[in-house]
Amino acid sequence: MSLQSYDKDIYDLVNLELKRQCDHLEMIASENFTYPEVMEVMGSILTNKYAEGYPGKRYYGGCEFVDEIEQIAIDRCKELFGCEFANVQPNSGSQANQGVYGALLNPGDKILGMDLSHGGHLTHGAKVSSSGKMYESFFYGVELDGRINYDRVMDIAKIVKPKMIVCGASAYTREIEFKKFREIADAVGAILFADVAHIAGLVVAGEHQNPFPHCDVVSSTTHKTLRGPRGGIIMTNNEEYAKKINSSIFPGIQGGPLVHVIAAKAVGFKHNLSPEWKIYAKQVKANAKKLGKVLISRGFDLVSGGTDNHLILMSFLNRDFSGKDADIALGNAGITVNKNTVPGETRSPFITSGIRVGSPALTARGMKEAEFELIANKIADVLSDINNASLQEKIKGELKELAHKFIIYDKATF
């Protein structure tokens, strides 16, 4: 029986979401469009199989084929990042990070991560996260120019003397200099942990420096710029760390892994290893740069003055509207972004003074610099007359026409 005939409520909502994805311009930096073959294997019979443990060391029988699947995913992941060990079982980036902490830290140990309000992530020690409750967390941030001051990070590290330094961000527009973080970690005897969830797709294409060999441990999601299924991974070159990480994931915080998602990760990694991937990643950066350049020319402020990666941060500190206002107005015009705090923030995290705008999803649809120039001008038009509802409706229609020239899916399920 089909989903449509068995559960029309869910079927209809899934197809409404398909329409939204096709009609709107998805510019949330952490979102992307995965491949049909990735979704196909996620919807396969692999979802039926329990496989507690690791390849060759399972607690259930009948794992001979899923062992091979997981090993393929592991091998492809190692090839992608140029590392010796990989765990492909984490169900999310947050669980991957939790697994790293559980493996290498004791409760109460000090960690030094990027401040959430400056572009870090909840799992880098934010007080509302388990990472900020189980461990004593300290923070570095960016200067008013939106860039990390590595000398300042060194000063903080020497005062704090953390057991672990976390580098990586969810809203940082410049290249992360892992070598400088290595020097800081060595100066204070800290473990260096990189969370590259946002930039992984650029890293594996050579469009951003690789955290290896500088970092002791690296985590990532497999969606975002990698365009795979939703999930997490952990990599290292340290065999002792690898064993501890494996134990921290299973049986530490997870039971049976999601075999259908691990298979989907393997399929995604095959895409990431293809020659076409480098073309995609290069275009992601080019599109983000074009977006930023046009917005600056239209008089808008960008944190750090531009971008080295897949996203820009627009700052409205000098405007009479908020990030939330911009988020809503652009949404009404058919452009999906997210409100975001910015350096020197004066508003609450629920209101903010900025928005985060990314290029990966529209690049996946086939859009290039010409389309991003047009879109940037439409963003500027909306924000220059932010209360003009009729203008928003007009632009929504224009952008829907553009979106329909770059349809990526013709159905909702695979």
From Swiss-Prot:
Signal sequence annotation: none
Main subcellular localisation: cytoplasm
Naturally occurring in which organism (per UniProt): Campylobacter concisus (strain 13826)
NCBIfam families given in the database record: PRK00011.1
GO cellular component: a single term: cytosol
Top-level EC class as recorded in UniProt: transferase
Annotated positions binding (6S)-5,6,7,8-tetrahydrofolate: 116, 120-122, 240, 348-350
Subcellular location: Cytoplasm
Function of the molecule: Catalyzes the reversible interconversion of serine and glycine with tetrahydrofolate (THF) serving as the one-carbon carrier. This reaction serves as the major source of one-carbon groups required for the biosynthesis of purines, thymidylate, methionine, and other important biomolecules. Also exhibits THF-independent aldolase activity toward beta-hydroxyamino acids, producing glycine and aldehydes, via a retro-aldol mechanism.
Annotated protein name in UniProt: Serine hydroxymethyltransferase
Quaternary structure, from the entry: Homodimer.
GO biological process, one term: glycine biosynthetic process from serine
Keywords, alphabetical: Amino-acid biosynthesis, Cytoplasm, One-carbon metabolism, Pyridoxal phosphate, Transferase
Example GO molecular function: pyridoxal phosphate binding
Annotated positions for site Plays an important role in substrate specificity: 223
Keyword Chaperone among UniProt keywords: no
Family affiliation: Belongs to the SHMT family.
Chain segments annotated as coiled-coil in the UniProt record: none
Pathway the protein acts in: One-carbon metabolism; tetrahydrofolate interconversion; Amino-acid biosynthesis; glycine biosynthesis; glycine from L-serine: step 1/1
Reactions mediated catalytically: (6R)-5,10-methylene-5,6,7,8-tetrahydrofolate + glycine + H2O = (6S)-5,6,7,8-tetrahydrofolate + L-serine
Cofactor: pyridoxal 5'-phosphate
